[in-house]
Amino acid sequence: MDFIGAYSQEHLAFLWDGFLVTLYVAFISIILSFFFGLIAGTLRYAKVPVLSQLIAVLVETIRNLPLLLIIFFTFFALPEIGIKLEITAAAITALTIFESAMLSEIIRSGLKSIDKGQIEAARSSGLSYTQTLFFIVMPQALRRMVPPIVSQFISLLKDTSLAVVIALPELIHNAQIINGQSADGSYFFPIFLLAALMYFAVNYSLSLAARRLEVRQT
């Protein structure tokens, strides 16, 4: 194990660049997947004729596919039908598709957890279905959904490492390149240990934030 060689200024800067790409891809994917997941989950909860059924089929299909397969599809299959995405866009698209399906189910379950008595009381007081959904059900449901949503975001951050298969210059990709510069593999343990600590620092911070939010709600 060569810690000194592995942790050279050049290597650390290169690894940090990969970490920034990981955070960027995760951040954009989180925003997009929450947006689409919220729409899909709400429409499934509202049971809009035909549309809800179509979304349910799409969500269940995506949830039962490996994320790696979706990454391959967005990067290698879409160009066959004239849609060519560069590496970062393909990674974000794949993560957004997969995580949107996961989040939509969390959101739908969260909305269903609200007591029907509150909904009936709101409707009897003169509120429309839409008003009841957005002003009574949604605010309460979102508070309950924070812990599982944060957990899903943590999974998303870790899942960015799968984009190494399409050569996204993220943390694991750059760690592999650094490791390849040692003829005897002496960089492997030091460099991947540091990569693991980087993932742990971010994910553990998110976990602590989720726990604190959960405690405040109880």
From Swiss-Prot:
Keywords: Amino-acid transport, Cell membrane, Membrane, Transmembrane, Transmembrane helix, Transport
A GO term, aspect molecular function: transmembrane transporter activity
SUPFAM superfamilies reported for this sequence: MetI-like
Domain ABC transmembrane type-1: 19-210
Membrane topology value: Multi-pass membrane protein
CDD domains to which the protein is assigned, alphabetical: TM_PBP2
Function: Part of the ABC transporter complex GlnHMPQ involved in glutamine transport. Probably responsible for the translocation of the substrate across the membrane.
GO cellular component, one term: plasma membrane
Membrane-spanning intervals of the chain: 19-39, 65-85, 188-208
Keyword Cell membrane attached: yes
InterPro entries membership: AA_ABC_transptr_permease_3TM (IPR010065), ArtM/GltK/GlnP/TcyL/YhdX-like (IPR043429), MetI-like (IPR000515), MetI-like_sf (IPR035906)
Highest taxon listed in the record's lineage: Bacteria
Localization annotation: Cell membrane
Quaternary organization: The complex is composed of two ATP-binding proteins (GlnQ), two transmembrane proteins (GlnM and GlnP) and a solute-binding protein (GlnH).
PROSITE patterns (alphabetical): ABC_TM1 (PS50928)
Induction entry: Positively regulated by TnrA under nitrogen-limited conditions.
Predominant subcellular localization, coarse grouping: membrane
PANTHER family assigned: INNER MEMBRANE AMINO-ACID ABC TRANSPORTER PERMEASE PROTEIN YHDY, MEMBRANE COMPONENT OF AMINO ACID ABC TRANSPORTER
Keyword Oxidoreductase: no
Protein name as annotated: Probable glutamine ABC transporter permease protein GlnP
